[in-house]
């Protein structure tokens, strides 16, 4: 068997990012041992708020070029407002990477994890993925402000291109082929006059190329409500930048803790490496205490394996994670008493027994 080695740029970042990235790397190395035919090489970069205080920037001038030499970027968490204002840390590192590596698609799975209590009374074993357009839409910089006082006006333009809209929809349909063959479109064409009817048209045209996939369209207000009342009915949801942002925050909450929510930022062309990061922040208040939940970062590592074409190995990691949480080996944020290291070590131990 030819040994495959994946070269990964690791950016632990701030706060608990350092702890959870180390935990996920340990799980990946263990998974590689179990697999026997692949390995992971991590190159760590110290880009963080501490780096900013020393160098006056969140990353060096050639930082993006450096990242292009790797097959993926594995990021922990960014931000510490006591050291650096959030807008500087966010735009100087995380958003800079997303934009310059053309990470136009954001993917966030959500499922009812065994042993973790959802805030829903009857969660009914939901398992879905939100695919969010990550490069344009409502979060454009087109617009402006004029006048002051009673005549003051702020104009914010949303930008929807056919290229980006069709790209995110095709990604969603291709993913649905590997899952339960259903795609839901998040729209608001009954209230947004131009952009959402365009979105609906592109969705219908794209769906015509995927005869085996069932489709539905839901207005964002109703869809947000359905996430709460019947999340088990969804498979793949495709959404614009703003709508996807809203839906993914709801989906993280449904799982019981933002600490277990994973995320992937994908360059669908493969021109540049994709970036994988958990949804949670840097949580500086608990950093260094062994309280951080490693599940979000480890699940994010599973998404990276899927991206590398190692879906079977990724599925094993997810299965073992659920076995561990089902047996009550959990951090405090999800009702347990275990430390970061104890959860990580238990996952590794069970992987070795496969």
From Swiss-Prot:
The keyword Signal does not apply. GO terms for molecular function: D-malate dehydrogenase (decarboxylating) (NAD+) activity; magnesium ion binding; NAD binding; tartrate decarboxylase activity; tartrate dehydrogenase activity. It catalyses: tartrate + NAD(+) = 2-hydroxy-3-oxosuccinate + NADH + H(+); (2R,3S)-tartrate + NAD(+) = 2-hydroxy-3-oxosuccinate + NADH + H(+); (2R,3R)-tartrate + NAD(+) = 2-hydroxy-3-oxosuccinate + NADH + H(+); (2R,3R)-tartrate + H(+) = (R)-glycerate + CO2. SUPFAM superfamilies: Isocitrate/Isopropylmalate dehydrogenase-like. Keywords: Lyase, Manganese, Metal-binding, NAD, Oxidoreductase. Signal peptide: none annotated. Pfam families: Iso_dh (PF00180). InterPro entries: ICDH/IPMDH, IsoCit/isopropylmalate_DH_CS, IsoPropMal-DH-like_dom, TTC_DH. Its cofactor is Mg(2+); Mn(2+); K(+). Mn(2+) binds at residues 221, 245, 249. Binds 1 Mg(2+) or Mn(2+) ion per subunit. The keyword Cell division does not apply. Its EC number is 1.1.1.93, 4.1.1.73, 1.1.1.83. Coiled coil: none annotated. Belongs to the isocitrate and isopropylmalate dehydrogenases family. Has multiple catalytic activities. Apart from catalyzing the oxidation of (+)-tartrate to oxaloglycolate, also converts meso-tartrate to D-glycerate and catalyzes the oxidative decarboxylation of D-malate to pyruvate. This is Probable tartrate dehydrogenase/decarboxylase. The lineage of its organism: Bacteria, Bacillati, Bacillota, Bacilli, Bacillales.
């Amino acid at each position: 068997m030819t040994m495959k080695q994946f070269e990964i740029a690791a950016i632990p970042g701030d706060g608990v990012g350092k702890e959870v990235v180390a935990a996920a790397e340990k799980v990946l190395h263990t998974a590689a041992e179990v697999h026997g035919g692949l390995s992971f090489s991590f190159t760590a970069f110290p880009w963080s708020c501490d780096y900013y205080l020393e160098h006056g920037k969140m990353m060096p001038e050639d930082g993006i070029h450096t990242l292009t030499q790797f097959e993926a970027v594995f990021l922990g968490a960014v931000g510490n407002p006591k050291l650096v204002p959030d807008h500087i840390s966010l735009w100087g590192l995380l958003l800079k990477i997303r934009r310059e590596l053309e990470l136009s698609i954001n993917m966030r799975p959500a499922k009812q994890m065994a042993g973790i209590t959802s805030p829903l009374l009857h969660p009914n074993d939901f398992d879905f993925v939100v695919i969010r357009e990550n490069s344009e839409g409502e979060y454009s910089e087109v617009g402006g402000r004029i006048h002051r006082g009673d005549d003051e006006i702020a104009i914010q333009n949303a930008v929807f291109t056919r290229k980006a809209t069709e790209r995110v929809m095709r990604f969603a349909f291709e993913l649905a082929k590997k899952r339960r063959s259903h795609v839901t479109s998040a729209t608001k064409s009954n209230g947004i006059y131009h952009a959402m009817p365009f979105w609906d048209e592109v969705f219908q045209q794209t769906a015509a190329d995927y005869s085996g996939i069932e489709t539905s369209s839901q207005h964002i207000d109703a869809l947000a409500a359905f996430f709460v009342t019947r999340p088990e009915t969804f498979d793949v949801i495709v959404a614009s930048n703003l709508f996807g942002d809203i839906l993914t925050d709801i989906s993280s909450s449904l799982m019981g803790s933002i600490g277990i929510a994973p995320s992937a930022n994908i360059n669908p062309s493969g021109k540049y490496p994709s970036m994988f990061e958990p949804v949670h922040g840097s949580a500086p208040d608990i950093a260094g205490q062994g309280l951080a939940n490693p599940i979000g970062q480890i699940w994010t590592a599973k998404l990276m394996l899927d991206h590398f074409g190692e879906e079977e190995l990724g599925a094993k990691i997810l299965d073992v994670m659920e076995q561990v949480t089902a047996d009550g080996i959990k951090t405090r944020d999800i009702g347990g008493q275990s430390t970061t290291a104890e959860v990580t070590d238990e996952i590794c131990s069970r992987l070795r027994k496969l």
